[in-house]
Amino acid sequence: MQSYNVFPALVIITTLVVPFMAAAALLFIIERDPS
């Protein structure tokens, strides 16, 4: 039953990381914009 705790942890990590990566990509694109 220990391995069952891995899935919720992955869901939480994904939920936290995905918006951060999206924001970082947005900032990177905005910074690269010559305008």
Curated annotation (Swiss-Prot):
Instruction: Give the main location.
Output: membrane
Disulfide topology: none
Entry's Gene Ontology BP terms = photosynthesis
Keywords for this entry?
Cell inner membrane, Cell membrane, Membrane, Photosynthesis, Photosystem I, Transmembrane, Transmembrane helix
Localization: Cell inner membrane
Gene Ontology cellular-component terms for this entry are:
photosystem I; plasma membrane
Where does the chain cross the membrane?
10-30
Q: How does it sit in the membrane?
A: Single-pass membrane protein
Please indicate which superkingdom the organism of origin belongs to. Bacteria
Assembly notes: The G.violaceus PSI reaction center is composed of one copy each of PsaA,B,C,D,E,F,L,M and Z, and forms trimeric complexes.
Q: What is the official name of this protein in its record?
A: Photosystem I reaction center subunit Z
Source lineage: Bacteria, Bacillati, Cyanobacteriota, Cyanophyceae, Gloeobacterales
Gene that encodes it: psaZ
